[in-house]
């Protein structure tokens, strides 16, 4: 039987994971960019989508209901939708604007919380096992002065702590919750970094295994492993995929 993955986001890591998962299974995409969601759905084939803002509790509830209406069940959830709020004023702690902090926490941390809450509600009601993978960041574990965005790092740290706490609670009923923590990845969100020659040079040394930024496909491959039954003994883990970031000066 094909397994159903509910995934948030429609570009970058989300798009790469959806394409890889849909080669053998079913995908339901949740995102706030209708055109991107539609294009990705058409590209991967075995997929459907619902346009929704993950910060909105009712929109999240409706999106999960739409997935259930379409496929009858949800086997796995990958929360990858997120933002960087640098353009809104995120930065070093003494410079970070409160509005930027609120925005990035709202999208990244609250959005992940709401999606987990809704899907876990379905699973616990139906006595169903399942797997959740949330998206953290290497910046929550191994900070770098050149990437000092306190709001973003804080939001990812919140996701990691929430995931581990929830994993402990739900493990006895067969629900697994893990985190994937990418290094710097070549996605639309990292466009500013991609355009900066100094950052590009720094990343050659910071992520020596990839000689720079990781690809979205690098993360998607590990994500699919963590979402499949192949990883069934794992829960409460933060799996770092960083091209060598954490072991490089």
For each feature predicted by the language model, list its residue ranges:
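Conserved glycine-rich Rossmann-like NAD(P)H-binding loop of the short-chain dehydrogenase/reductase
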Residues: 24-39
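Catalytic Tyr-x(3-8)-Lys segment
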Residues: 198-218
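Catalytic loop of short-chain dehydrogenase/reductase
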Residues: 83-84, 133-158, 163-164, 168-172, ...
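Canonical Rossmann dinucleotide-binding motif of NAD(H)/NADP(H)-dependent dehydrogenases/reductases
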Residues: 1-28
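Short, small/polar-rich loop/turn modules that mediate ligand/substrate recognition or access, typified
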Residues: 171, 176, 234-236
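Substrate-binding pocket helix/loop in short-chain dehydrogenase/reductase
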Residues: 88-93, 97-102, 203-204
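Short C-terminal tail/terminal secondary-structure segment
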Residues: 84, 224, 235-249
């Amino acid at each position: 039987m094909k397994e159903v993955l509910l995934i948030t986001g429609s570009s970058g890591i989300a798009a790469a994971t959806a394409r890889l998962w849909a080669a053998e299974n079913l995908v339901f995409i949740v995102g706030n960019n209708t055109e991107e969601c539609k294009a990705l759905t058409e590209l991967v084939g075995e997929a459907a989508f619902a346009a929704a803002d993950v910060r909105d509790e009712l929109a999240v509830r409706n999106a999960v209901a739409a997935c259930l209406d379409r496929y009858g069940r949800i086997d796995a959830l990958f929360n990858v939708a997120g933002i960087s709020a640098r353009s809104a004023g995120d930065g070093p702690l003494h410079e970070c604007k409160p509005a930027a902090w609120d925005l990035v926490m709202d999208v990244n941390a609250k959005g992940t919380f709401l999606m987990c809450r809704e899907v876990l509600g379905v699973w616990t009601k139906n006595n169903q096992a399942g797997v959740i993978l949330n998206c953290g960041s290497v910046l929550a574990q191994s900070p770098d002065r050149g990437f000092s965005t306190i709001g973003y790092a804080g939001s990812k740290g919140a996701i990691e702590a929430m995931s581990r706490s929830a994993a402990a609670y739900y493990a006895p009923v067969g629900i697994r919750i893990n985190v994937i923590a990418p290094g710097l990845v070549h996605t639309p969100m990292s466009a500013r970094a991609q355009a900066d020659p100094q950052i590009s040079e720094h990343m050659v040394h910071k992520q020596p295994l990839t000689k720079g930024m990781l690809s979205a496909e690098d993360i998607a491959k590990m994500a699919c492993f963590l979402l499949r039954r192949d990883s069934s003994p794992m829960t409460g883990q933060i799996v770092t995929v960083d091209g060598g970031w954490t072991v490089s000066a």
